[in-house]
Regions:
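Exposed, low-structure sequence patches enriched in small/polar residues
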Residues: 1-219
């Protein structure tokens, strides 16, 4: 426990890429994060991830994307043992991208995953599955509109009332609905506006809505 260190982050990543008609990317990533802002002590988080990305053109106008990930997570705290947690699991996200023309496409995705581990000295095991739809529209050279909607159901198998926030890609027990809408509009070559609207409705956040607007100038 070094009280003189407030925050320390270390990341390493190795990638291997195969290009062609079928593009494959494999990676291994390691993250170590020390959070010492709390005067009571430090939290040390270690996470490891290995995965494969696959991009395949089925035929003109249809691409298939698949990401499979294996991951592990471990948090140890000198503040309280109740903050300690460890878990491992997997997540798979497959998307079918339909391109209608150069300015519009739709992604329809299926997500499934599982995670198990220990939190507060209790074991947990959770399965999750859901769908995701992403729509992108380009308006000439002046704007871009994108909407993403996801619905995921997570089920806990060991009667735990909650799971760690890192489990199954951050989805809590029960039904989760999330949406993200972004509008990027270029007023001129040097000025642009970005608006984003996010919504979350699940067991952690009840009808949570955030809105953000930006005006960007490039000189």
């Amino acid at each position: 426990n070094d009280s003189s260190v407030s925050r320390l982050f270390f990341n390493s990543r190795i990638e291997a890429i195969s290009s062609g008609k079928r593009r494959v990317t494999a990676w291994i990533e390691n993250n170590n994060f020390l959070d010492g802002f709390d005067p009571r002590g430090n939290d040390l988080t270690k996470s490891n991830e290995a995965g494969v990305d696959l991009l395949q053109t089925a035929f003109t106008g249809l691409d298939i994307k698949n990401r499979f990930t294996l991951k592990s997570h471990n948090t140890r705290s000198s503040i309280s043992r109740l903050r300690d947690r460890s878990m491992s699991g997997w997540w798979n996200d497959i998307q079918f991208q339909l391109r209608f023309n150069r300015s519009s496409d739709v992604n329809i995705g299926l997500m499934i995953g599982a995670e198990s581990g220990i939190q507060q000295n209790n074991e947990f095991s959770v399965n999750a599955c859901g769908i995701k739809i992403v729509n992108k529209i380009l308006y000439k050279d002046t704007g871009r509109f994108q909407t993403e909607i996801s619905f995921v159901t997570a089920k806990e198998n060991d009667d735990s009332s909650f799971i760690p926030p890192e489990a199954v890609n951050g989805y809590p027990i029960g039904n989760s609905f999330r949406s993200n809408t972004t509008l990027h509009y270029f007023v001129s070559r040097s000025i642009s506006m970005v608006f984003s609207l996010n919504t979350i409705d699940d067991s952690r956040y009840n009808n949570f809505i955030t809105f953000q607007g930006e005006v960007r100038a490039h000189f």
